[in-house]
Structures are given as C-alpha cells and as structure tokens.
Regions:
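A transmembrane-helix-recognition feature enriched in membrane-embedded lipid enzymes
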Residues: 1-58, 110-114
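Conserved H-X4-D acyltransferase segment
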Residues: 6-13, 42-98
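Short, flexible loop segments at the rims of nucleotide/cofactor-binding pockets, characterized by
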Residues: 49-52, 73-74, 122-126, 155-157
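Thr-Gly-centered strand-to-loop micro-motif
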Residues: 60, 97-99, 121-122, 149, ...
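Non-catalytic C-terminal accessory region of glycerolipid acyltransferases
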Residues: 129-258
Length: 258
C-alpha cells in the first residue's frame, strides 16, 4: 500500500514536472553555452522527481570532485532513479552517455537531447564508437561526461562486467576518472519493477583516479581499479560527512551548483 501511494504521488508530481521541464528545456537548451541552462533546470526536475516518490537524497564526498577541469564520472547502474540522483548530486556541469531509446521518450527525451546528452546504441557497434568519439570531443571542449561502465542496470546488485569504451576515452585524453557509488536506488526502484519504495539514495564520490602517464594497454588495470573503488563506495567504506537535500533546502541548494 505504501509503495502504491508513493508511486501515485511520484506520477502525479513527476509527470507534469517532466512535461514542463521537457518543453522549457527544449527551448532554452540551445541558448549558449548549449545545454548549461537546461542542466540547471534538470537539477530542479531531478530533486522534484525524487521528493515526489518520497526518496531522500544524500551526497557524500562532493569536495573530491575537481573544479575547472573535465573528468569522466563512472557510476554503478542499479535503477532508473540513478539518473535523477546523479543529476541532483553532481556539483559540476556534466553530460551523460545514455542509451539511445531514452531519446525517443516524449518530453524527457527532448530535454536530455537539449542538454547535450549523448545517445549510445548498444546494438550497433559502429554507432556506439561514434558516440564515444563525440564524448571525447566534449571532453576536449572542457566538458565532463558521465558513463555507466556496465552499460545496463544490474538486477541483483552485483557489478556487471565493464565495457572498455569510457576507459579508453579517459586514457587517450589523460583526464582523471571520478568513481561514483550509488547505494539505495535498487531498493527504491529495482529493474523491471514499477512501484517505488520510499527510502534513501546515497551518492558517494571517490577520489579522482589519475590516467596521466598510463598507456592504452593499461586499461585492464584501470578497469580493476575503478571496479574496486565502486565496490567500496557502494557501501559505507571511507564515506565522507553526508549532505542531505530535502524539501526547500533541496531546491535552494540548486542555486549554488556550478
């Protein structure tokens, strides 16, 4: 009953929020610098969606995120709620690599396209390579990108095998990887489930992992290093003092995001 009520409120709050954000975002998304204005609005959308589902958001280790230089964020993927949680928690401008089918969704797809998110067609290797090349272009332009190295959501909570594309981008560009561990999304909304369970999502930022001086042939070692970091961050190991976003404080904090 609680999950049914939370889902009903989530839909009543989230649907009009998504429609409005999609329409407005599509218009302002093309105001230079492209996508930045839409991303600020998306943070409001993300917090509203989470609050509508009675999902509390905590963020830990935001001070570890470098400012003024591009990075590759890499996060574990547990739930559809990963997207709003990460949008709300990441304190810098960032572009996501997301599966191509999301861009076909009315309003939501329009908004993420306007934000400059990059579609990835996992079924078409050539198109997938092109998407990673586009991500590399964004990095060269000074933009950070976020990649789910598993490329799909886990069903049992275990980390899935990593794909190498994001690691090759970071190595070739010589920019650090910031591991981001999510704890709680799968409990609130697991894959193949459509009823939200009220709860808490914690987003933990790890220390940047440098890639300067490493060769492309070192990608296997780098992948294992990131995997170990994500395994630790998904639990309570090395957690920084939490920052909680709730109610009006959640909305107010958006204005201080950079």
């Amino acid at each position: 009953m609680v999950r049914l009520l939370a889902t009903a409120v989530f839909v009543l709050v989230g649907l009009p929020n998504t429609i409005l954000s999609g329409l407005v975002g599509t218009v302002v998304g093309f105001i230079p610098p492209r996508g930045d204005w839409t991303l600020h609005g998306a943070r409001l959308w993300a917090r509203g969606v989470l609050l509508g589902g009675f999902v509390r958001l905590k963020s830990e280790g935001r001070e570890r995120v470098p400012r003024g230089e591009p990075v590759v964020f890499m996060a574990n993927h547990e739930s559809w709620l990963d997207i709003p949680a990460l949008l709300a928690a990441i304190p810098v401008q960032v572009r996501f690599l997301a599966k191509k089918s999301l861009f076909a969704w009315p309003f939501f797809g329009w908004a993420i396209s306007a934000m400059g998110f990059i579609p990835v067609d996992r079924k078409n290797r050539r198109e997938a390579v092109r998407s990673f090349e586009e991500a590399a272009d964004r990095i060269r332009a000074g933009r950070s990108v976020l990649i789910f190295p598993e490329e799909t959501r886990t069903t049992d909570g275990a980390l899935l095998p990593f794909q190498r594309g994001g690691f090759l981008i970071a190595l070739k560009a010589g920019i650090p990887i910031v591991p981001v561990g999510l704890e709680g999304p799968r409990r609130c909304l697991p894959k193949h489930n459509y009823l939200i369970r009220p709860g808490t999502i914690t987003v933990r930022f790890g220390a940047p992992i440098p890639t300067v001086g490493r060769r492309v042939t070192d990608k296997g070692e780098l992948m294992e290093e990131v995997r170990a970091a994500l395994e630790a961050l998904r639990g309570n190991d090395g957690a920084a003092e939490p920052v909680t976003f709730e109610g009006r404080d959640a909305v107010r904090s958006v204005g201080h995001a950079h």
